């Protein structure tokens, strides 16, 4: 469960979040959509403790992020919009590092490596990986701890259509197992019908809520927008 109450964040003279209230429930995929600059990424950064709000509260499970950050963040796994890895480390090095950080066994590394099709990339430096393979590596890192709360910023970017479909299926499976899944995206056509709830951010708040099956009705411009697919 993620509960956001009265979240406010200002950068310079610009208020990006203005008393934002959001809840994301276990067993559901909650989608954040909206125009560029509406606060999607800022919201996720607040949830993950990467930036502090000017006001408001974030609770993950039953743990207040400000009062008990370690307990709150231990429940969470985060995929940033543009994952970065040390260019000289291999994909295997990256997975081993994050597994050790979480105290996970090598069997868990093997499981996510197989899940995200990374066996051939294991010994390759991340600088030599295609954009799609790097994104799958980031998704493997996200999947390592099997966390009860998943937070993803534009997870479908750089993936080819088959891997996108696999990603959506994996997130639905995680939700069925009881995970809380919070996703920010602008790929509205890709996500039409994929989520349980869709929250449209406007002027730093939730402007409206709609079923994700109605995304293309609510945002008709997405029907003609070409799919942003970068194969790899």
Where are these regions (language model features)?
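Q-loop/switch helix immediately C-terminal to the Walker
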Residues: 88-101
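Helix N-cap at the start of a conserved alpha-helix in ABC-type nucleotide-binding domains
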Residues: 161-163
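Catalytic Walker B motif of ABC-type/P-loop ATPase nucleotide-binding domains
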Residues: 150-154
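Conserved structural motif at the start of ABC-family nucleotide-binding domains
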Residues: 2, 17-19, 73
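Conserved ABC transporter NBD signature motif
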Residues: 56-67, 71-72
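Conserved ABC ATPase "signature" region
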Residues: 96, 106-121
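Helix-to-loop junction immediately C-terminal to a conserved catalytic motif
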Residues: 48
């Amino acid at each position: 469960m993620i509960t956001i109450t009265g979240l406010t964040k200002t950068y310079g003279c610009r208020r990006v979040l203005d008393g934002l209230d959001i809840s994301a429930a276990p067993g559901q995929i909650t989608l954040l959509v909206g125009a560029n600059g509406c606060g999607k990424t800022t919201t996720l950064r607040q949830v993950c403790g990467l930036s502090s709000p000017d006001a408001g509260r974030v609770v993950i499970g039953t743990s207040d992020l400000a009062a008990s950050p370690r307990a709150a963040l231990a429940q969470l796994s985060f995929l940033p919009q543009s994952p970065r890895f040390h260019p000289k480390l291999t994909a295997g090095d990256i997975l081993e590092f994050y597994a050790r950080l979480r105290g996970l066994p090598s069997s868990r590394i093997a499981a996510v490596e197989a899940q995200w099709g990374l066996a051939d990339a294991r010994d390759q430096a991340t600088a030599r990986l295609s954009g799609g393979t790097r994104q799958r590596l980031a998704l493997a890192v996200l999947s390592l701890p099997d966390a009860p709360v998943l937070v993803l910023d534009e997870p479908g970017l750089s993936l080819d259509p088959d891997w996108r479909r696999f990603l959506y299926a994996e997130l639905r499976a995680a939700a069925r197992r009881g995970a809380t899944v919070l996703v920010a995206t602008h790929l509205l056509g890709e996500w039409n019908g994929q989520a349980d709830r869709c929250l449209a951010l406007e002027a730093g708040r939730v402007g409206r809520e709609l079923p994700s099956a109605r995304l293309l009705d609510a945002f008709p411009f997405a029907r003609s927008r070409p799919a942003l697919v970068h194969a790899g």
